[in-house]
Structure formats: structure tokens, C-alpha cells
Regions:
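Charged, solvent-exposed interaction patches on well-folded alpha/beta domains
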Residues: 2-163
Length: 163
């Protein structure tokens, strides 16, 4: 019974105890989804360990961030942990793409793409958080913010805004 329960994608662990003469005690630890993972044009729920869960009722989790890209399920835990330290950025996130199985791009509100570095993700998020406050980037005519080089912020304006 324990093994059958643990084969269900939503069950992290299970224990079953028999209490004679006629009782069983079942304890189940459930997996908790942390993101919606898009793979091969299908949406899946993803837990903190990178395990893909059965997606019955995925609409009940539309508040979760969407992540895309090969290997994203393995790196989502760290990315979402760092992102969670910056609620202003987290609230602007539309989806995140894992690029080349090594770094992240974010699409935030108003269609802005933020290119993040492979390393020092927290530092890059801190810079984004600071410049967003100072310059109102989240409400401007910015198309792209490139933070891949740590000592530079490269900003690209929308083509229609440059005229």
C-alpha cells in the first residue's frame, strides 16, 4: 500500500501502520506545486524538487509563476527562491525562460524582457530592483534590460518609442 501511494505524483512520502486487530493508520506527505512548467507546449505543475505533478485542476494554481525551457524544472527552485526576495519584481513577472540550460530571461509586465546572468542572480535582481525604483522602468517605454554583464545595465527602448 505504501509503495502504491508513493507512486502517485502528488504524494511525496507515505507511511502505513497496522494496529491490530482491525485498524490501519495512513500518513501522507503531499507535494506542493511552486510553479507551472511549460514543456512541449503542455503545462505541468512542478514541485520544489523539480518533480512534475499530474496537472488535474491546473487552473486552481494560476497564481504560480510560469517557467519554460529545457532544464528549467531542475533550476526553478533556486531561481524562484531568489525571485521571492524581490516582491516588486516577482509581482511583475509574466513568465521566465531558462536559456541554454544555464541562465534565465524574465518577461515582466508591459512586455519587458530582462536578461539575467548565469551567475550572481541575486546581485542582478538587486540591481533590477533598485533601478526599477529609481527610473520607473516597469512603467516606461523599455523593451529590454540586459543584466548579463554585472557591471553594466544595458537598456533597449521600444522601436516605436524611439521616434
Amino acid at each position: 500500500m505504501k509503495n502504491r501511494l508513493e507512486q502517485l505524483s502528488w504524494i511525496k512520502s507515505a507511511s502505513v501502520q497496522r494496529k491490530l486487530p482491525n485498524k490501519f493508520y495512513v500518513r501522507v506527505s503531499e507535494r506542493v506545486p511552486i510553479a507551472i512548467y511549460q514543456s512541449n507546449y503542455k503545462l505541468h505543475l512542478l514541485d520544489i524538487d523539480g518533480k512534475i505533478l499530474e496537472n488535474d485542476g491546473i487552473g486552481n494554481f494560476d497564481n504560480l509563476p510560469i517557467i519554460v525551457g529545457k532544464g528549467a524544472e531542475k533550476s526553478a527552485r533556486h531561481f524562484l527562491y531568489v525571485l521571492g526576495k524581490f516582491p516588486k519584481i516577482q509581482n511583475q513577472l509574466v513568465f521566465a525562460v531558462f536559456v541554454g540550460e544555464r541562465r534565465w530571461n524574465m518577461r515582466i509586465n508591459r512586455g519587458i524582457t530582462v536578461k539575467l546572468p548565469e551567475k550572481n542572480l541575486g546581485y542582478a535582481m538587486q540591481i533590477l530592483d533598485e533601478i526599477a525604483d529609481e527610473n520607473g522602468f516597469f512603467h516606461s517605454d523599455i523593451q529590454e534590460i540586459d543584466l548579463r554583464i554585472l557591471d553594466r545595465v544595458i537598456v533597449k527602448k521600444r522601436v516605436d518609442a524611439q521616434r
